C-alpha cells in the first residue's frame, strides 16, 4: 500500500489501473510510457522538434493498443486497422536534450462504428509541467482495400472511452 493523503491506495502494476497520480494528468490513470529527449530529437532551435512529438504519440498509442490486446498481428487477423484522419496538437512548452518525458494516452471518444478520438498528454517528469496536449481522430479501415470499415467487436470492446476527469 502507498500513502495517499489520509487514504491508502493499493500498489498495482496494470498500466490502466487507478493509483496515486503524482503528475498532473488530465485523467486519473492514462496509459503511460517514459522517454528521454536525445540530441537526435532536437531541431535547429535546440529543442525537441515538433515532428518528434508526433512520433512519440504514435509510439504511446501503439503501446496502449498492444496493452489492450490489439497489436498489429490482431489487426491483420481481423482484417481491420485504425489510421489517423486528423491530429490536433497544442505545444505548450519546449523540451530539451536530457528531459525525461511521460507520454500519456487514453481513448477520449469512440462511436463503436468507424471512428474514435485518442487523447494525449506529455508531461515533463522533472517539474510536472504539461508540455503537449493533443488528440487524434482514428478511422477503422479494411486492411486490404484501405476503405472505411465498421469496427470489429474486438475494437469496440477494447477501445472504451475514459469518461472520468482527474
Kindly label every feature range from the protein language model.
Residues 10-67:
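Catalytic strand-loop segment that frames the active site of acyl-thioester-processing enzymes
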Amino acid at each position: 500500500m502507498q500513502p495517499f493523503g489520509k487514504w491508502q491506495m493499493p500498489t498495482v502494476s496494470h498500466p490502466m489501473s487507478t493509483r496515486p497520480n503524482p503528475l498532473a494528468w488530465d485523467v486519473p490513470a492514462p496509459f503511460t510510457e517514459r522517454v528521454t529527449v536525445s540530441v537526435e530529437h532536437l531541431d535547429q532551435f535546440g529543442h525537441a522538434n515538433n515532428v518528434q512529438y508526433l512520433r512519440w504519440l504514435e509510439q504511446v498509442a501503439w503501446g496502449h493498443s498492444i496493452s489492450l490486446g490489439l497489436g498489429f498481428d490482431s489487426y491483420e487477423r481481423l482484417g481491420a486497422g485504425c489510421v489517423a484522419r486528423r491530429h490536433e496538437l497544442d505545444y505548450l512548452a519546449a523540451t530539451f536534450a536530457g528531459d525525461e518525458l511521460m507520454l500519456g494516452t487514453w481513448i477520449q471518444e469512440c462511436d463503436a462504428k468507424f471512428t474514435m478520438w485518442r487523447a494525449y498528454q506529455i508531461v515533463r517528469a522533472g517539474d510536472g509541467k504539461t508540455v503537449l496536449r493533443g488528440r487524434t481522430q482514428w478511422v477503422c479501415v479494411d486492411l486490404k482495400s484501405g476503405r472505411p470499415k465498421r469496427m470489429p467487436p474486438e475494437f469496440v470492446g477494447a477501445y472504451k472511452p475514459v469518461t472520468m476527469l482527474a
